[in-house]
Amino acid sequence: MSKAERLLWFVSTIEDTRFLKAFYDSYEGAIDVVHLNLLTRISLIGFEANHYIPLNKYANKTVNPDVSKIFNLLSGRLNQDETLLAYQSVWGLLDSFKTRYNNSVFVIPSGRHVHHVAATDFAKSRKTKRLYINYSNFPGYTFFDPEGTDCLASIYKRPDLLDEMYPEPIDAKRVFSKFYELKKNQSTIPQASSGGLNQILKKLAFSLDTIMQKLIGYVGDRRLTLSAVFAKKNTGDFFEYDEVDLSNRFMFFPMQVSTDQQVLVNYKGGSIEKALEEALSLAQSKNLVLYVREHPAEANRDKVRKKLEEMRQSYTDIRVVSQSVSELIEHSVEIVTINSTVGLECRLAGKPVSFLGDSFYEKASDMQLAKYLDRYLVEVDYHKSIVSDNDINKILKLLR
């Protein structure tokens, strides 16, 4: 490896900090850290690095971007003023470094938070290299890209980059079969919503973090009041699923998390409720019944189920089902999705699929999709972090 570059790594979750530490164990260069909340700072006590918190005192008030489409605001994690202040504080912090990170790489998991957006805009203005990280949703694989995640990724803008990077053709059928089986046999998803006591403890931690943020003058990636921690749920876990015959002709709609970036930002409808209506309209136009499956990581379950129940009461051609995703894909006539991994699974299975949102999975050819899976994704598990020298070399090569 050539001389290792200094990395400025943005972290917002415990998973981020674990992966950072695993990466650091095999990395030859220095890594400094920007914290999007105080919980990550606590988790990295003892980690040898420069640690930064974008305090309000750093805010550059001359920078006034439009924050109306930023995830933290749309998801209700921050209000308008908090979102703008967080952006300005990150910009001001980075500007205070002067030339310290001119030849560094900003490492930005997800890219969705306002702090990530500010870091991205600042890096672009200084021509600083960036590396983004996202879950691949295939166990044992992680996505890295120099321009962004989802529809901001370099390969979304230009799927033909995959042909330039990997000019030799590969056996797409073999790759599709391998990854379809990998997903089909996945028993749990790492980001699945935890319930009961674990969920309360997680919310309690964020509410305490909110108190600390206010005490030191800082806007993190979310603010959560104590009252929200113990807010009473209306419907609990009781919900009646429809009994269905999978031999009937139907269109399958796998729901995404209502606060997902794909729903709030990358889908023009802007809400899961609108997506449900659009999916039903598409099914009706093809004389198909719509089978809907909830997302297991949905945190706003009561709100989503209320909408589902309203639609069941209003229409006779919608069913809410509990069968496995693989069964529903196999037996459906067609699938409609916003931009979920299920859409990719359908491509792998050769099933007709319609995407409501912006999606690389829709734009890529079969060969490009196979190269993405087999060559572009890095075989390292973000949630079970063991990172080798070879993994790091492959990741950093993507900076091209």
Please name every model-derived segment:
Residues I108-G111, H115, S322-M367:
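A donor-sugar binding/catalytic signature common to diverse glycosyltransferases
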Residues E277-V320:
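Catalytic donor nucleotide-activated moiety binding site of glycosyltransferases and closely related
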Residues I45-G76:
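Conserved nucleotide-sugar phosphate-binding/catalytic loop shared by glycosyltransferases and other
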Residues V244-L276, L280, N287, R293-E298, ...:
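Active-site donor-nucleotide binding/catalytic segment of nucleotide-sugar enzymes
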Residues I170-L246, P254:
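Extended, charge-rich helix/loop segments that form flexible
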